[in-house]
Curated annotation (Swiss-Prot):
This is Poly(A) polymerase catalytic subunit. It comes from Rabbit fibroma virus (strain Kasza) (RFV). Polymerase that creates the 3'-poly(A) tail of mRNA's. SUPFAM superfamilies: Poly(A) polymerase catalytic subunit-like. It holds the Pfam family Pox_polyA_pol. Its EC number is 2.7.7.19. Belongs to the poxviridae poly(A) polymerase catalytic subunit family. GO terms for biological process: mRNA processing. The keyword ATP-binding applies.
Length: 470
């Protein structure tokens, strides 16, 4: 045994390391040095300040917080499983290396905020949005309750923290969804704050520790296999606290953004395209049937933004929108005619199975596919005059051989997402797609083509049980 490392392990474990502990943990000696040298008093002070600023309603004393922190940093002393020791070291290392910069900094005075004057009045456009959603309100409500509807009572506290976090870390964290629309239009109601960031796992682990230390309760971090780079934080009752998608820095750079009150939001034109896509998912249409007013305000806000930004005249002239698709049910591929627009491709093959797209891209021997991760939920490839892509939602049919207009709009929006993220001009097709929302009749759904079935195991980070699975 190396005497210096053995002494370090003795200091950390509070006991002489066994032979197996020594050999398994000796390569962790640098991380262990960081943990031992970490100033717990300063850390406890930061936790208390975070509690005072964002969780003041939580009934836990300063003494209890200190006990909780010190207890976790000595947890290894009563742990003899090598696997659990590895987990404790990994989580403690994340905490001592990142917490101050990620969440501790939120207790300091921030930069001056310059309130945005960008606010949108939706009175004139709300009737158009109402009519559009009335035509799309064709789903039969099921009794299934989606997990996203089980909300933790901690959400309001975390939202307050997230507002500050988005301002301090606006180079690597942006928001989208209802909160971003609330910044444009205070009529929009929001629940949790939806975010994209480049260090999602680190942030959520730090937040999990903060919640653990100031509430005394365990929270669990889950990685969902069928959503790309998605993690969700849940409380002890399995209620949703916050989720986050992780994206690469290069993806972050190509996303068009709008700065409002020192917070970057995903450009509402891109969000409108995502909303078009969302309506092709049958359970989202059930949400529409349950609460049409909530979605009406959101759709109207997005429509008003793009109307103003792109100078769109709302007259119902939709030209080639939505672009029509023809479904091959056996191959689960849709052939969409895009020739009506000046794109760099004449048609688009929309795959309903991601593995089939990946296989065909390999067969094409093409190496210039672009993947915008969960921003588009698909890779895109142009080969010849064809755009190849994958569509992750259900496809609705209005009769046995005809794709429903809702899904045609969704696929058209998916194609425009590619145009937006690659910096191409979208003014005319966007204008046409928005105008295609007008003067529609309600058409019932004949059949739902199921979405791609993803397989895989949930990953988990459980601080209390010392578990990390990938």
């Amino acid at each position: 045994m190396n005497a210096r490392i053995a002494d370090l392990l003795y200091n950390y474990l509070g006991r002489p390391p066994s032979l197996s502990e020594y050999h398994m943990l000796k390569l962790q000696h640098r991380n262990i040095q960081k943990i031992i040298a970490f100033n717990k008093d300063i850390f406890i002070s930061l936790i208390k300040k975070n509690k005072k600023k964002f969780f003041s309603d939580i009934d836990l004393t300063s003494s209890e917080i200190k006990t909780s922190v010190l207890s976790y940093f000595s947890k290894q002393r009563d742990t003899y499983s090598i696997g659990k020791l590895y987990t404790i070291i990994e989580l403690q290392t994340i905490l001592v290396s990142t917490y101050t910069d990620v969440l501790g900094v939120l207790t300091l005075k921030g930069p001056d905020m310059f309130p945005s004057s960008t606010r949108y009045d939706i009175k004139s456009i709300k009737q158009i949005a109402t009519s559009a959603l009335h035509a799309m309100n064709v789903a039969v409500i099921s009794d299934k309750v989606m997990g996203r509807h089980n909300v933790s009572p901690l959400v309001s506290n975390v939202n307050a923290l997230m507002e500050e976090y988005l301002r301090r870390h606006n180079k690597n964290c942006i928001c989208y969804g209802s909160y971003s629309l609330y910044l444009l239009n205070p009529e929009v109601k929001y629940g949790d704050i939806d975010i994209l960031q480049t260090n999602s796992r680190t942030f959520l682990i730090d937040l999990a520790f903060l919640i653990k230390f100031i509430t005394g309760s365990n929270v669990v971090l889950l990685k969902v296999p069928y959503l790309k780079n998605y993690m969700v934080l849940k409380d002890k009752d399995d209620n949703h606290i916050i989720d986050s998608f992780n994206i690469r820095q290069e993806t972050m750079q190509v996303i068009p953004k709008v700065l409002i009150d020192n917070i970057y939001i995903v450009d509402p034109a891109l969000q409108l395209m995502s909303m078009f896509k969302m309506f092709s998912q049958i359970d989202r249409l059930e949400d529409l049937a349950r609460n049409p007013e909530k979605l009406t305000v959101r759709l109207a806000t997005l429509m008003e933004y793009v109307r103003v930004k792109y100078g769109i005249i709302l007259n119902g002239e939709s030209n080639h929108m939505p672009m029509k698709g023809v479904l091959d049910k056996d191959k689960r591929i849709i052939d969409v005619d895009t020739s009506g627009y000046n794109f760099s491709f004449k048609k688009c093959y929309v795959y309903l199975d991601e593995s089939s797209l990946s296989s065909d891209i390999l067969d094409l021997n093409a190496d210039d596919a672009v993947d915008f991760e969960n921003v588009s939920n698909s890779a895109y490839l142009i080969n010849g005059d064809v755009l190849y892509t994958y569509f992750s939602n259900t496809i609705l049919l209005s009769d046995p051989d005809t794709i429903h207009e809702i899904s045609n709009k969704a696929m058209s929006a998916h194609i425009l997402i590619y145009q937006i993220l690659t910096g191409n001009d979208i003014r005319q097709p966007l204008s046409d797609l928005v105008n295609s929302l007008m003067y529609n009749e309600k058409v019932l759904i004949h059949e739902v083509i199921p979405r791609d079935k993803k397989t895989g195991k949930h990953g988990i980070v459980d601080i209390e049980k010392d578990i990390i699975t990938h």
